[in-house]
């Protein structure tokens, strides 16, 4: 059995999460900024279909990308050197979420529905949720969004309309976060795409301990303005 959350119910301990489905911890509650911030600080995230009860997850193991471990393939490195794109932050947050919600091959439905868009847009307005965007000739062609708390970034979703567009956004995000002392990018679940870029699985307990240190650092709740000049040595 999983715990049912009401407006004032705290999350249960992570070790109470189910083994199957992996990481299901609780149901109910709401998507208020306070609830979402508390969830991320503890290594919990919402994931549910439109019209269903809110489900909260903390899978074990957890997929993370340590910024200093980012891997760039030869083909992606060539694309980066061409520099025919522009990287922006927080200039089209809702557009990025809507693009991430668009139907994808072999998928039926999406978990990024209007309720989620509204909740994360509120976080964005508070300077907590952010987007990193890849633009070409004034057109948004790829990007990602997530939540920043302390020195941890929690990635939520990414999209590409042209090859490598989301990878480019992730590369620039990782480089900027490394420069600013961020400890990790939470990738939630294992994917071959993220593993190819250096992400790896760690035990949930280790992830939780890292978050305890990283999210306890001073908040910088503001719109992001990064210097996206690609280092020449790269």
UniProtKB/Swiss-Prot annotation:
Record-given protein name: Leucyl/phenylalanyl-tRNA--protein transferase
EC number(s) recorded for this UniProt protein: 2.3.2.6
Record's keyword terms, sorted: Acyltransferase, Cytoplasm, Transferase
Localisation: Cytoplasm
GO cellular component, one term: cytoplasm
Similarity annotation: Belongs to the L/F-transferase family.
Organism per entry: Nitrosomonas eutropha (strain DSM 101675 / C91 / Nm57)
Cited function: Functions in the N-end rule pathway of protein degradation where it conjugates Leu, Phe and, less efficiently, Met from aminoacyl-tRNAs to the N-termini of proteins containing an N-terminal arginine or lysine.
Main location: cytoplasm
Catalytic activity line of the entry: N-terminal L-lysyl-[protein] + L-leucyl-tRNA(Leu) = N-terminal L-leucyl-L-lysyl-[protein] + tRNA(Leu) + H(+); N-terminal L-arginyl-[protein] + L-leucyl-tRNA(Leu) = N-terminal L-leucyl-L-arginyl-[protein] + tRNA(Leu) + H(+); L-phenylalanyl-tRNA(Phe) + an N-terminal L-alpha-aminoacyl-[protein] = an N-terminal L-phenylalanyl-L-alpha-aminoacyl-[protein] + tRNA(Phe)
């Amino acid at each position: 059995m999983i715990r049912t959350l009401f407006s004032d119910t705290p999350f249960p301990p992570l070790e109470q999460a189910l083994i199957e489905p992996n990481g299901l911890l609780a149901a109910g509650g709401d998507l208020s900024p306070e609830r979402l911030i508390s969830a991320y600080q503890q290594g919990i995230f919402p994931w549910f279909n439109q019209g269903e009860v809110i489900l909260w997850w903390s899978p074990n193991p957890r997929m993370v990308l340590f910024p200093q471990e980012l891997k760039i393939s030869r083909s992606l490195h060539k694309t980066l050197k061409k520099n025919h794109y522009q990287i922006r932050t927080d200039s089209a947050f809702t557009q990025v979420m809507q693009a991430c919600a668009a139907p994808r091959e072999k998928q039926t439905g999406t978990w990024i529905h209007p309720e989620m868009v509204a909740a994360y847009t509120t976080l964005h307005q508070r300077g907590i949720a952010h987007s990193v965007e890849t633009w070409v000739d004034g057109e948004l062609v790829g990007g990602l969004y997530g939540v920043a708390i302390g020195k941890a970034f929690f990635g939520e979703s990414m999209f590409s309309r042209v090859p490598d567009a989301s990878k480019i956004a992730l590369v620039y995000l990782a480089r900027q976060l490394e420069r600013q002392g961020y400890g990790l990018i939470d990738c939630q679940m294992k994917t071959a795409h993220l593993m190819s870029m250096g992400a790896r699985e760690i035990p949930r307990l280790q992830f939780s301990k890292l978050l305890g240190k990283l999210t306890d650092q001073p908040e910088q709740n503001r719109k992001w303005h990064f210097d996206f000049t690609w280092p020449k040595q790269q």
